[in-house]
Amino acid sequence: MTGAVCPGSFDPVTLGHVDIFERAAAQFDEVVVAILVNPAKTGMFDLDERIAMVKESTTHLPNLRVQVGHGLVVDFVRSCGMTAIVKGLRTGTDFEYELQMAQMNKHIAGVDTFFVATAPRYSFVSSSLAKEVAMLGGDVSELLPEPVNRRLRDRLNTERT
């Protein structure tokens, strides 16, 4: 059985992320989406909300599960019994950063990283950009899964009142 981990903060999960999850799920027997905890960062959505949003957005992927990850990604990968990391790449800048991380992960833990080129329709999408556009009143419904878009709208409407 082959398995891979798709790590990230997913604050919030976007359709670009879901596209990578779907493609990973087609290549691996099991995929774990690792929602990583970074104590130095405070996101818009808390950990429980991010878990719920990823689960709600991936119900169509029976070989995918969602877990919380702490510490080094490679330690998480090994604790899950997985052997690989899958990362989506939007730009050359993503590649430069992720290549260094992949080489370090291979060096310290023997974990391989598989890069998946983001679908062109999502190449400009990021969680940060989606939140920023939504905060300024823009429509991000084509960038986010419906359950995520609904939660984001609700959050912003609550903050405005």
UniProtKB/Swiss-Prot annotation:
Complex formation: Homohexamer; dimer of trimers.
Chain residues that bind ATP: 9-10, 17, 88-90, 98, 118, 122-128
Gene behind the chain: coaD
Binding site for substrate: S9, K41, V73, K87, N105
One cellular component (GO) term of this entry: cytoplasm
Species in which this protein is naturally found: Mycobacterium tuberculosis (strain ATCC 25618 / H37Rv)
Location in the cell: Cytoplasm
Keyword Nucleotidyltransferase: yes
Main location as per UniProt: cytoplasm
Higher taxonomy: Bacteria, Bacillati, Actinomycetota, Actinomycetes, Mycobacteriales
Cofactor: Mg(2+)
Signal peptide positions on this chain: none
Reaction it catalyzes: (R)-4'-phosphopantetheine + ATP + H(+) = 3'-dephospho-CoA + diphosphate
Described function: Reversibly transfers an adenylyl group from ATP to 4'-phosphopantetheine, yielding dephospho-CoA (dPCoA) and pyrophosphate.
Molecular function GO terms recorded: ATP binding; pantetheine-phosphate adenylyltransferase activity
Protein name per Swiss-Prot or TrEMBL: Phosphopantetheine adenylyltransferase
Superkingdom of origin: Bacteria
